[in-house]
A protein has these predicted regions:
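Membrane-interfacial loop-to-transmembrane alpha-helix junctions, especially the N-terminal start
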Residues: 12-15, 74-86, 144-150, 224-227, ...
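Internal transmembrane alpha-helix with an interfacial aromatic "cap," most often the third helix
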Residues: 64-70, 96-100, 104-106, 115-152, ...
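C-terminal transmembrane-bundle signature of multipass membrane proteins
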Residues: 197-202, 226-289
Length: 289
């Protein structure tokens, strides 16, 4: 039996403590008057929005600690996946603290902080596919200029987020006029479609262009399909929230309703993404024993 060096044992034991301390330091370094907000100052949709910002911050932080603690419980080939999972929710927790502060102090559901978060975390979510299934299951299909599967996922995510931001901040109104919000939504959907075409859909309606399903380990098949379900079904919540964004001029603007939809979508998709990947990694690790 292989002997694990004592320093590596120490690192494994200290990782959870370091994770907790890191999250605590981040919280203290961003402390503001938002810490002392009184929930009694809110009612109705405003109260729900305030509540979900708080729950979002705490749940993302808890998920970060969980994924860091579980990283060494899976085989080495799946630890990158666990690292990505931790990064996604850790970065989200940091931004949710800021978004909660902006709402408490200024009454604003911040679009800018939201997209700062998405610009980092959504590409990481898309890259979860190649990190989980491994190089052996990735096809040789390429898109000219863009490249292979990982590049398509990355490009599609950035394209989607970029056009969404343009639509929600009114950047394209001078170019597209009153239809800017709708056109940006449609253009953003192109990036979403790219990821689905590359990674596949959960219903087996089309063969994925970037993944060879026959080469994916049996233990990972359920998790892979669950990730596809999040992409195809779970992400539908985001364009619904976009419709209520005040700057898009699509439906009657309601920043609280938009914020609630986005917060719920983030908690479901970001935490859920990591959980199903962890389940697959644990199952595949057990099969290797």
């Amino acid at each position: 039996m292989e002997t694990i060096p004592s320093y590596r044992k120490g690192l494994r034991m200290s990782a959870p403590i370091l994770a907790v301390l890191t999250l605590g330091v981040l919280g203290l370094s961003t402390a503001s008057a938002a810490e002392y907000a009184d929930p009694n100052d809110y009612s109705g949709m405003a109260l729900l929005t305030f509540f979900l910002f708080f729950v979002g911050y705490i749940s993302m932080g808890a998920a970060f600690i969980f994924f860091v603690m579980e990283r060494n419980s899976v085989a080495e080939e799946y630890r990158t996946t666990m690292t990505i999972s931790a990064l996604i929710v850790g970065i989200a927790a940091f931004h949710y603290y800021y978004m909660r502060g902006a709402y408490v102090e200024d009454g604003i559901v911040s679009v800018h902080y939201r997209y700062m978060d998405w610009l980092i975390t959504v590409p990481l979510m898309a890259l979860k596919f190649p990190s989980l299934v491994g190089k052996g299951a990735i096809t040789d299909n390429k898109i000219p200029v863009i490249g292979g599967f990982a590049n398509v996922c990355l490009f599609g995510a950035v394209w989607m987020i970029g056009w969404g931001f343009a639509g929600e901040t009114g950047l394209m109104v001078d170019t597209f006029g009153d239809n800017a919000g709708l056109l940006c939504l449609l253009l953003s959907g192109v990036g979403w479609a790219m990821i689905i075409v590359a990674a596949g859909d959960p219903f087996g309606l089309m063969e994925p262009k970037g993944i060879d399903n026959s080469k994916v380990k049996e233990e990972l098949q359920w998790s892979l399909n669950a990730l596809r379900m999040f992409i195809v079904v779970g992400w539908v919540i985001y364009p619904i929230g976009y419709l209520f964004s005040p700057e898009t001029n699509l439906l009657e603007g309601n920043q609280e309703l938009m914020g609630v939809l986005y917060n719920v979508a983030d908690m479901i998709n970001k935490i859920g993404f990591g959980i199903v990947a962890w389940m697959g990694a644990k199952k595949a690790t057990a099969a290797m024993a």
